[in-house]
């Protein structure tokens, strides 16, 4: 299955096309995974750093998806190789059961619980080769396999996307939202070498972006993406709502500067009413205008998106919903806010001007003890 965005035709082509309106452009390929043949989700900038296919083989393990699109995950383990799978997802196991050891592992419960990421996993190891079947409880899911060789890191955008993994050097760490950034709340960063199995709702598609290309995606549809220099930024399309300018007479400012309103704003009743108001505003932004919240990705990168979207409250926190809603429509927030520094010549000129510009103050003392200061240049 192959789709082209944008383009008037649906011919599978990767050539540059000329448009009288948009100029030179290249079609972005979206392909479904897994399929009967190997589909690389990397581009020329990553040099085959990782692949997502219907099977992935490492020196000590082999992952293979059985059936499509709603399927089982078959895992073949060599001796002394560890398999981590989400608790309650193991369907069956073949081999010598007396050599198999299963241990319940609690992975960073405090950090993962705070972010809503599952932290109960089952560690399976054996002294002899075994084969295991892994599945999920949801009837509308599909799998995507990622084989990492240590050159490209991945960010898992969905909290429940990670199903199983293997690899001694593979590291999976949850990421906190330190600066209210939408791209690092409830996510998991995957680094190292190994094989991981991701699960998504519906069918999973891969989108490859090259240098200079952009793509807008809904956060509830994004399963994972490769780490890049510029993280995805919140984006809102321009709204067609007609706003009527109302002159500001300053009545509200003068009203809130009164002693009555100042004392009222410090009361518990006022704080309770404001909490209810902000909760209702966040609910309306998430429920009614939730489809206006998007993420903008900059190439080169690779995205994995799912056809069935999760709920917005499963992806974004309350403060993130408000952050995107307050973003100016049609623009994105810069990844790094550069601090404007004046040139050295301008700084020296300003310093010299301040030194040459002297002021003199005259103090007048009255009989009643009152002192008046008058500044002269």
UniProtKB/Swiss-Prot annotation:
Keyword hit for Isomerase: no
- Localization per record: Mitochondrion
Q: Where is this region: Disordered?
A: 340-362
Q: Locations of Basic and acidic residues compositional bias?
A: 346-358
Q: Name one GO biological process term.
A: inner mitochondrial membrane organization
Keyword Mitochondrion in annotation: yes
Which positions form the organelle transit peptide?
1-35
| Keywords noted in UniProt | Mitochondrion, Transit peptide
Lineage, top-rank taxon, reads Eukaryota
Where are the coiled-coil regions?
Answer: none
Which InterPro entries does this entry report, sorted A to Z?
AIM24, AIM24_sf, Trp_RNA-bd_attenuator-like_dom
One term under GO cellular component: mitochondrial inner membrane
- SUPFAM superfamilies attached here? TRAP-like (SSF51219)
Q: State where it is primarily located.
A: mitochondrion
In terms of Gene3D superfamilies, this protein maps to: Mitochondrial biogenesis AIM24 (3.60.160.10)
Q: Which family does it belong to?
A: Belongs to the AIM24 family.
- What this protein is called in its record is Altered inheritance of mitochondria protein 24, mitochondrial
Q: Could you tell me which species this protein originates from?
A: Arthroderma otae (strain ATCC MYA-4605 / CBS 113480)
